[in-house]
Amino acid sequence: MFTKAMNIADFDNELAQAIADEATRQEDHIELIASENYCSPRVMEAQGSCLTNKYAEGYPRKRYYGGCEYVDIVEELAIARVKMLFAADYANVQPHSGSQANAAVFLALLEPGDTVLGMDLDHGGHLTHGSKVSFSGKTYNSIGYGIDDKGLIDYDAVAQLAEKHRPKMIIAGFSAYSQVLDFQRFREIADSVGAYLMVDMAHVAGLVAAGLYPNPVPFADVVTSTTHKTLRGPRGGIILAKANPTIEKKLNSAIFPGSQGGPLMHVIAAKAVAFKEALEPSFQKYQEQVVENAKTMAKVFIARGYDIVSGGTQNHLMLVSLINKGLTGKAANDALSRAHITVNKNSVPNDPQSPFVTSGIRIGTPAITTRGFGVNEVKKVANWICDVLDDIDNEEVILNVRNKVAELCAEFPVYGQ
């Protein structure tokens, strides 16, 4: 028999210590990884609830297990809220991740060997958009499009690739592109060759929900997303679409039983909480600050002599090329980590370095904005980053920045009292 007094610390000190240390790291370090954020205590409460005990294979009111009357309510709430958030006619909230959501779309709409046109990983795409190390590039014939010399997507070049290769599906989406996608143009290109259009809005879903980035749902056949990142929910995925009974049936079957078994009801509950939070007016103000903070940081980097791929940002992230500084992404990542500033090394277009080394770093503002950083704070942070990178082997500079980071983080706790 269990008691509510049971806790990890009294039973598993090693694990408890690792969790405590991670909590300290999150409070004491500045988090600039573009795909990370802090979810609310409400979201975490749902994830830690008794719903983790319940198996619920199938969909609401059509389960293969008994006792699902309450988890049906949970999933229906999540579905209704996310449909409202993105003006979608269809929603599946069961994908365990964004990659699982993408895999389900491939399974639903394509056959092995079909041609897919997506953004090159080296130019800002995602592994699941056709990378040769992913299922998307191993099971399917993947063709990549990229960015031009100005760091922008060349839609005429995309159209030419589509005409040449006649893909069955075109993917619009990215993991490191700082500009706004033209979904109308992607729709026209897809229609010109009779292709499906899938949009992966994982990185910008929060901006879309707040009306600060174009909504892809009216243009795409299918839209996928994660529920963390800018959406600030639990780690998970969703699939959205306009009304299309044929596609809806294929998508549902591709998730269950096609690629997943029982849904994670505790995570779906957390998604429902996050979707309700995203419907609040305060969420729009948060997203506005995310974008303003990103634009501010980009201007500081440019003023300090650093190259931003595509010349700036129109969303929450930027890709900083270090080629002109003679630095690698790995060296920059390691030095900034010692200063308690967390970024991730990232390949840049035509990168001479390997993916394990890279010539760039990706920076995003969702997490620091959640903890309350505004324009004044992000100016400081951007300048501290430049201070470290300008003298990357100077441990005294790194220590000085780390002390400043500690003071700033203490002023803006992630989880206050």
UniProtKB/Swiss-Prot annotation:
User: For this protein, what reaction is catalysed?
Assistant: (6R)-5,10-methylene-5,6,7,8-tetrahydrofolate + glycine + H2O = (6S)-5,6,7,8-tetrahydrofolate + L-serine
Q: What is its EC number?
A: 2.1.2.1
Q: What is its main location?
A: cytoplasm
Please give the pathway this protein is involved in.
One-carbon metabolism; tetrahydrofolate interconversion; Amino-acid biosynthesis; glycine biosynthesis; glycine from L-serine: step 1/1
Biological processes per GO annotation: glycine biosynthetic process from serine; tetrahydrofolate interconversion
Residues with the N6-(pyridoxal phosphate)lysine modification: K229
What this chain does, per the record? Catalyzes the reversible interconversion of serine and glycine with tetrahydrofolate (THF) serving as the one-carbon carrier. This reaction serves as the major source of one-carbon groups required for the biosynthesis of purines, thymidylate, methionine, and other important biomolecules. Also exhibits THF-independent aldolase activity toward beta-hydroxyamino acids, producing glycine and aldehydes, via a retro-aldol mechanism.
Return the annotated site residues (Plays an important role in substrate specificity).
H228
Query: Can you tell me which residues the record assigns to a coiled coil?
Result: none
Subcellular location(s) per record: Cytoplasm
Q: Which source organism does the UniProt entry give?
A: Dichelobacter nodosus (strain VCS1703A)
Name under which the protein is recorded: Serine hydroxymethyltransferase
GO-annotated molecular function: glycine hydroxymethyltransferase activity; pyridoxal phosphate binding
Q: State the family named in the UniProt similarity comment for this chain.
A: Belongs to the SHMT family.
What domain of life does the UniProt record list for this protein's source? Bacteria
Q: Which residues bind (6S)-5,6,7,8-tetrahydrofolate?
A: L121, G125, H126, L127, S354, P355, F356
Keywords associated with the record: Amino-acid biosynthesis, Cytoplasm, One-carbon metabolism, Pyridoxal phosphate, Transferase
Its GO CC terms are:
cytosol
Q: Name one Pfam family in it.
A: SHMT
In terms of Gene3D superfamilies, this protein maps to: Aspartate Aminotransferase, domain 1, Type I PLP-dependent aspartate aminotransferase-like (Major domain)
Describe its partners and assembly state: Homodimer.
Q: Which coenzyme or cofactor does it need?
A: pyridoxal 5'-phosphate
Any transmembrane segments, and where? none
